[in-house]
Amino acid sequence: MRSKVIRGGCTNLQQIACRRTLGGMWPYVQFTDTFQVGEDVWGTLDPNALDPAHTGKAAAIYIVPHKTAAQWTADNSLNHLAVLGGNAATQKWITQSWCTNANLHLLWSNASQVGDYDVVVDFGNNSTTLAGFSQDDHYDMPLDIIDGYIVPGFRVVPDPAVDTSFSHVGSFSYTQPSVTVTSDGGSTFTVPITANVRFPADVAGATSASDISAAQSSYPVVVCVHGNSSHTNSFEGYDYLLDHLALNGFIAVSIHMQPGQQGTDRARILQNHLPIIFSLFGAHAANNVGIMGHSRGGEAVVIAARLNQQEGWGWNINAVISLAPTNQYTFENFGGAWARPYLVIYGSLDGDLGGIGDTGFELYDHASGMNKSMAFIYRACHDRFNTVWGDGDFFFGQLTAADQAAVISANSHQLIAKGYMTAFFRQHLKGETQWEGIFRGEWIPASVSASDPGMKIYTQYEDTSVETVDDFEGVHTATSWQSSTIGGAVSQSGLPVTPQENDLRSMDSQSPHLTAGLSLRWDNTTDSLDYSIPAGQRDVSGFQAVSFRVSQRVNSASNPVNQAQDLRLTLTDGGGHSRAIRISKLAEIPYPYVRGVASLVKSAMCTIRIPLAAYHIHCFNVDQVDLTDVTTLSFQFAEKVTGEIEIDSIQFTN
């Protein structure tokens, strides 16, 4: 049985915890293992994974604190959460065979209790009626079903923008002799080695590295590198972020740069600070480092990751964040031996780096070999992430008065920085996997969403475990689009113009991307683009999702103004079974953000991820796709009569 977690074993494991999809339309659910405090936890049983003996049987469903396999063996009793009413209040129903939706129930409204949980379906006395059913309050193998066991079935997690694990922040500053560095342009800068430091403390008022909390033997280190400004105290503009990181168990440092510094010279100053930080904290500072850079600093931290490896600096740089970065000095290809998890954050109303080129889109496109993510934040600007800079980029000529009025608040900017950066560093420096969904675009921290009623964040994401169907790289000709990266034929039906494959910016002057892609337009709901999956590549059952990057094309008359685009992604198997998933039920293909200066509006791609479970869960009167034998992947333009989009990175992925 596909629900048996261990070959030959008797543990029936099935994904149960889920979210309802937008609009409550089929495929109805998106299975997940992470919910924020305040979210609704739904649960369903996929008839495909039910033993025939389970169908049409009464069952009680429990949410219980997670137990390991050994703990379940020692004690298989079930204790439904007290907050849900205990065992007397378990939900009960008759399992259905005809559709996943028929087994869909709200398990926990407004989940309020942070923790790790398992979901257990108890078939009790194996009754076919609720009247005759008696639950036994035990997890009995092989009859009962569990979502959990080896790992938690799901987690309820706090908001990373406000969550803290320590009560106090220690702080001090240091200044050491200046260092002279040479910039990428050949200029020299003499830079005071000055920094602000925050760390977790056990008491208020701690001002020495020796006062670091005794709760842990050592702590990861995060260093922030600011960008260019005439202010000589720019490094102080991230104190709010340092405080939050310290309260989450990091030694957090923001370092000074001189006005006018460029890229590599900023990386050299970072190089000079790291030994000082580790000397101050000794064994309390773990060689487990995250680096964040803003603007020119955002390019500098990518340079630093490369130099650390090439020159043997000796630091374990394990996470890199570029906030509204430049891409103008060394034009990095972040990857290879120095590839590390990477996050880019950038706003649609950046008033300093608002151009089509020289932005984080380019750094993201040229990063490879790591888990990478980019958050494109509608209405965020450049300078409000730094409290010293304030609204400085309002006056650089790239933001109109209407743009300035539309920019989200300084508080929203700070919550974004605290939420996304803390979650990223907690994931990659502390191994806390519960934050992954943020960077796949599955959820936004609640305080971030609540900080502005129109908050929109669109995510690009790429995993290291992928099977690429097409990335559109290589030699481009009029017919090169007809052959995919995976080696299959590509065809179209009904499109009014032949699709064009080329470097995106050569096809669309509004594209911020430095990568190849496909541009296409449709004018009928019967139009399609079809990818043949060659033999030997058709088993995608080991992946979690199918994904692609997509953007509406700026200024295209085919895209309805101020409307999201929509389409269906269809998989077909060797037996001719097909299922089409409507994108708008899982994600959004947004209309390009229109800012006051038309030349700065961007055809910015986001990543659409469709769980492969959506293609094989049981839905009434809809084909189930055999994921071990997928022969065709099709874009079907059946949802909107017209449209023009650019696509890239078609992948089966985790």
Tell where the protein language model's regions lie, with residue ranges.
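Extracellular ligand-binding interfaces
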Residues: A69-H80, W522-V622, D629, F637-N654
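Short substrate-entry loop that stabilizes the transition state in hydrolases
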Residues: A204-T207, A214-Y219, C224-Q262, G351-G354
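Primarily recognizes the serine-hydrolase "nucleophile elbow" in alpha/beta-hydrolase
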Residues: F278-G336
